[in-house]
Amino acid sequence: MRHTGRALILLIALALNLSALGIAAAGDWPRDYVVKENSESPDGHYAVLVQSMDAATGQEDNESGVYLADVKSHTTLGNIEKVDYFEHQNHRGLEVFWAPDCSYCVIENDGRYGADTISILEIKDSSFVQTEIGDRIQKSLDGAMKKQSHDSEMAGDVSPHFRLGTDRKVRVRAVSQNNPKQFEDVKTYYALFQGTYDLAAKKWTVTDARSITADQSGALDVGYQNPDFENTTYANEDDRAKSLDEQMNQVYQAAKFILPPARFAKVKHEQTEWLKKRDATSSVKARCELMEKRIRDLQDVLW
């Protein structure tokens, strides 16, 4: 009996230690939970579980836990903290971005206007370590807008973009504004955050936040987005070409703003030579294909 009590105390202590370290323990697949759409890892091993819409709408409280799961073993690796979302929930969003080697992911929990929380989930055997990075991004963006507006209460939304590599570094670009509803009587301020979080070092190695203009914010937002060319439809090839040309010009303007003068001079020369090649192409379809590739190449420069 004495040994049983001691073992129970040790188990409780271990659970508390894991929680303090941000490590979530494994468990059974929760009832009425489904795999969140587009949350699976590239190798199909892991996914994020959310409560089904039917189950969530039938409960009294408004909170719905979210889990990281091992799909192959049909078990959970643990509850994801500071994330509250159920299937197809209105005015909220949940996005998952996986590293190429599936060893970690970024989970973005969105509210009505921008991200509420942003965390890195690093898989460790049958559990994971959660690191919250959204607070630093939010504070940096708010700081840039406070400086610009001279208002200590100034705050804005966060629209983040991520690139995850096999070097275990999370590259973040985020734009922000304080007036998402675009009220005419509210002066709008904009800001940009650029940062790199090193998982191995457990710290930000690069951070930069600055105020920007409305035009710069719009161009950067297009520049950082992952275009879905394959699933975008147009009435005809001419409309497609016009849309792609507008996108390319926005990304080019983003590069002009963000790059050092010497680096942009090289991009400008490359763009001039590329335009000659495009304009010499007679087929509209072929020109569109050239523009899609050029957009992606210019986007890579922004990172």
Q: Which role does the model predict for each range below?
A:
Residues 215-303:
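N-terminal alpha-helical modules
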Residues 51-52, 108-109, 174:
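Recurrent small/Gly-Pro-centered beta-turn motifs in extracellular repeat architectures
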Residues 1-7:
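Positively charged n-region of N-terminal signal peptides that target proteins for export
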Residues 22-40, 56, 113, 117, ...:
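Acidic, small-residue rich beta-repeat scaffolds with periodic aromatic anchors
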Residues 35-98:
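Short N-terminal edge-element motif at the start of the domain
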Residues 92-129:
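Extracellular-facing segments of soluble proteins and assemblies that are Gly/Ser/Thr-biased and enriched
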Residues 8-20:
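Bacterial N-terminal signal peptides
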